[in-house]
């Protein structure tokens, strides 16, 4: 198979069925995902949430109904079941010190979901589990020593000299941080294969609604539980099927915005605060951030609509503002909107669900698909995480 090289990037030959990855660049080799068994259709959310929390406040019901419609979410999954509420009724008692109970549930649940997602990913990858040299584990939903990275490694049967990295409490941008860290590991350790796993549950923040905590209702209407996994490595072998190349990664925070998104762990669980100006702050800074990433593609004529977009769907308002600010064509954020509809905002996991949809979309387009794209996520800080991605998929 012949190929030419322009701007440091390998190009397809006319007979190729996949773009060739650049030597030494990290590539995505397989994906997996997992969810708890409890499915929550959005149309049933209000009735179930108010019943479980023993709330009969008409104002709260009306507010939650409105939020459920505006989120665009249709389906979510949750660890929380009636059996759990029967065992721990104090979870629905205002002011009850329940952090111990919440962690008993969460610590086990996130590892089990991570295990299922990882097994699916490894199966798609097709190589022995012993070939995994590094594991990066991302979660904002568990607290213990040792962490979920060790428990997951043991359950998967990874070698006891596997190199482990645990990323705690990053929030919604954690999945892209994990990709950035895994990219650095893969590119600086020749022959390495990195398993990145993210796993999240909302059990730490579940509580009865209170008018003094309006964000709790946003969380009830928007967030879900689940896990995701991806194998990352440079210089793929013939037995591997790379579909995206992580060409460049960057993180930055917006000075003076650390109070816009806050989470504080208390005896009652984790209390969140979300500023109403979050979408505006993202809108005001997104264009410069994206141009910084695009500049690394080596094509100064490239415009926003010349690329594919994998954006963490923090909520419809963020997607709408980004779309308007960058003058994106409607279909550019379709994978992000689809992930939001199907799973809700699942914190760090969600970007990997978006990338799975994007992989399918690029494959369907074949030679007509864009070669370059951006992966973006936003979270506490306000922190921006970004990836310049190169699609390796063609017809």
From Swiss-Prot:
pH dependence: Optimum pH is 7 (at 30 degrees Celsius).
Keywords assigned by UniProt, alphabetized: Acyltransferase, Developmental protein, Endoplasmic reticulum, Flavonoid biosynthesis, Transferase
Tissues expressing this chain: Expressed in flowers and flower buds (at protein level), and, at very low levels, in roots, seedlings, leaves and stems. Mostly confined to anther tapetal cells.
Gene Ontology annotations for the cellular component aspect, listed alphabetically: endoplasmic reticulum
InterPro entries in UniProt: Chalcone/stilbene_synt_C, Chalcone/stilbene_synt_N, Polyketide_synthase_type-III, Thiolase-like
UniProt-annotated location(s): Endoplasmic reticulum
Active site as annotated: 172
GO-annotated molecular function: tetraketide alpha-pyrone synthase activity
Positions with a binding annotation for CoA: 63-70, 274, 314-317
Residues reported to bind substrate: 224-225
Enzyme class label: transferase
Main localization category: endoplasmic reticulum
Annotated family: Belongs to the thiolase-like superfamily. Chalcone/stilbene synthases family.
Complex formation: Homodimer. Interacts with 4CLL1/ACOS5 and TKPR1.
Protein name: Type III polyketide synthase A
Organism: Arabidopsis thaliana (Mouse-ear cress)
């Amino acid at each position: 198979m012949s190929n030419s090289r322009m701007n440091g990037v390998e190009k397809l030959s006319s007979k190729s069925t996949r773009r060739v990855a650049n030597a030494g660049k990290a590539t995505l080799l397989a994906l997996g995902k997992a969810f708890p068994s409890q499915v929550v259709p959005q149309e049933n959310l209000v009735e179930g949430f108010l019943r479980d929390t023993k709330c009969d406040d008409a104002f709260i019901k009306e507010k939650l109904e409105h939020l459920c419609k505006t989120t665009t979410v249709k389906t979510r999954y949750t660890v929380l079941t009636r059996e759990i509420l029967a065992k721990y009724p104090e979870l629905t008692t205002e002011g009850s010190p329940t952090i111990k109970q919440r962690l008993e549930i969460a610590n086990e649940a996130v590892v089990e979901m991570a295990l299922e997602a990882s097994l699916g990913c490894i199966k798609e990858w097709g190589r022995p589990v012993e070939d995994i040299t590094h594991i990066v584990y991302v979660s904002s939903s568990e607290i213990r020593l040792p962490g979920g990275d060790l428990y997951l490694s043991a359950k998967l049967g990874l070698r006891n000299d596997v190199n482990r990295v645990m990323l705690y409490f990053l929030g919604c941008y954690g999945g892209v941080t994990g990709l950035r860290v895994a990219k650095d590991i893969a590119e600086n350790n020749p022959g390495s294969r990195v398993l990145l796993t993210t796993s999240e549950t909302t059990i730490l923040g579940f509580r009865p609604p209170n008018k003094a905590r309006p964000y709790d209702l946003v969380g009830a209407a928007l967030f879900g539980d689940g896990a995701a996994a991806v194998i990352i490595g440079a210089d793929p072998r013939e037995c591997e099927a790379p579909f995206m190349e992580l060409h460049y990664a960057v993180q930055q925070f917006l000075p003076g915005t650390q109070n816009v998104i806050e989470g504080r762990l208390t005896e009652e669980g984790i209390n969140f605060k979300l500023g109403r100006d979050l979408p505006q702050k993202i809108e005001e800074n997104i264009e410069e951030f994206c141009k910084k990433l695009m500049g690394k593609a080596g094509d100064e004529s490239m415009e926003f609509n010349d690329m594919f977009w994998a954006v963490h769907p923090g909520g419809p308002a963020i997607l709408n503002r980004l779309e308007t600010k960058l003058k994106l064509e409607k279909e550019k954020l379709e994978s992000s909107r689809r992930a939001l509809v199907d799973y809700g905002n699942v914190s760090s996991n969600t970007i990997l669900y978006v990338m799975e949809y994007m992989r399918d979309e690029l494959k369907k387009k074949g030679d007509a698909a864009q070669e370059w794209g951006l992966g973006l996520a936003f979270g506490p800080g306000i922190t921006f995480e970004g990836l310049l991605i190169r699609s390796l998929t063609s017809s």
